[in-house]
From Swiss-Prot:
Record-listed E.C. numbers: 2.7.1.167, 2.7.7.70
Name of the encoding gene: hldE
Catalytic site positions: 264
Lineage, top ranks: Bacteria, Pseudomonadati, Pseudomonadota, Gammaproteobacteria, Alteromonadales
The keyword Chaperone belongs to this UniProt entry's keyword annotation: no
Gene3D superfamilies, per database record: 3.40.1190.20, HUPs
UniProt-annotated binding residues for ATP: 195-198
Superkingdom: Bacteria
UniProt protein name: Bifunctional protein HldE
Organism the protein comes from: Shewanella halifaxensis (strain HAW-EB4)
Keyword terms, alphabetized: ATP-binding, Carbohydrate metabolism, Kinase, Multifunctional enzyme, Nucleotide-binding, Nucleotidyltransferase, Transferase
GO cellular component: cytosol
Function text: Catalyzes the ADP transfer from ATP to D-glycero-beta-D-manno-heptose 1-phosphate, yielding ADP-D-glycero-beta-D-manno-heptose.
Amino acid sequence: MKISLPAFEKAKVLVVGDVMLDRYWAGPTARISPEAPVPVVKVEQLEDRPGGAANVAINIATLGGSASLAGIVGEDETADALTLGIQTLGVEPNWHKVAGKPTITKLRVMSRNQQLLRLDFEESYTQAESEALLAKTLPELDKVDVAVLSDYAKGAIISPQSFIQAANAKGVKVLVDPKGSDFSKYRGAYLLTPNMSEFEVVVGKVESEADLVAKAQGLLEAYDFTAMLVTRSEKGMTLITRDQPELHIPTVAREVFDVTGAGDTVISALATAIAAGSDLPQACAIANTAAGIVVAKLGTSTVTRLELIEALSLSHGETGFGAVSEDQLAYALEQAKLRGERVVMTNGCFDILHAGHVSYLQQARALGDRLIVAVNTDASVKRLKGEGRPVNTEDRRMTVLAALASVDWVVPFTEDTPQRIISRLLPDLLVKGGDYKVEDIAGGAEVMAAGGQVKVLGFEDGISTTAIIQNIMANQ
């Protein structure tokens, strides 16, 4: 499924949490110190970047959304540097200033694109300081569609229940990047985005995919969350909701240089997409792509809308939406129909994809907004075509089909005909290639009874999988 970026400029998001300054000192290393067995870095570059909740806010602004930021800072030079950093990027701060405590700073010493040392300057904030911050932000809820709680366990978000309840009362969705062993303090939030380590701190060791889903569902029920997105490093992400099948989204990252701030990027992209009108699966796919971009950068970084567009155009078919299960597709179709999109469906074995197939699928896609391709499983192809078929396994056939620009979803079916799955999905238009009569097309009667249409398209003459196989064998 192609991912449509929403109008990010419509997104209005409030970010509350642990703000910090990521400071970088970088330079070459050519010798070992005579004082101790450590490298000497000749510092040639100084750079400050907003970090923590501040990084979430500037990611939203960089994508094109409107972000307001609330956090706790000290009365120091670091707070001034942080303020300047976010204002330069279009984010206005709403600080609760605390005397006698430093603004949280993480100083990284770098050489040859490698981190040699990190120094942390911080003191935890008190319950009273946290409550003062959250109370200060409540009026901002009238101005936004989504609120983000960015919790780094530094004390800015200790007991956020009053904030979450106030947001819910105003219809503002609360997204949480959580920390700690107790998720009950986030009760009532719309969505949590723990990474796998954070998730296992709460639920214990995850033994399997099914175990992950079951434990996440337990948290949704126990704490009244609507959804949970578990980020899983090289395994991608898993979205669990209360009433839909889980959605596994494979990673799109090809190179990983630095995971600093990757979690900030995920929740900022999610918040911006949701505030701009994307549904959850689309928002998660956007966040997954954004994370794949940012981990290829060094240090705390942001992602632009242009980078997202370029990445999505390059990685179509790798976002986890191309090849889907029947249940996932049924949910996606509901969302497509709510958006008023015209859905076209076709089916076939597509054993060896050739020019005739590509032309046919392009014709089918041109008849609507979305195209479903239902593919016979290996067992089904063997029954229909005989021994030696299929040449390509179903996962390979589905992968190739999903990579086509004309194809939105690819779904397998086990029967000899797609009548059952067509009857369940009921597309707006069912198409079939060849010399079929409309009344003979499997699932056609059900589609027409539901108000849909059935159409026969022509294949290009002289091109077929069977002919290709015969030609290959004749030339061996």
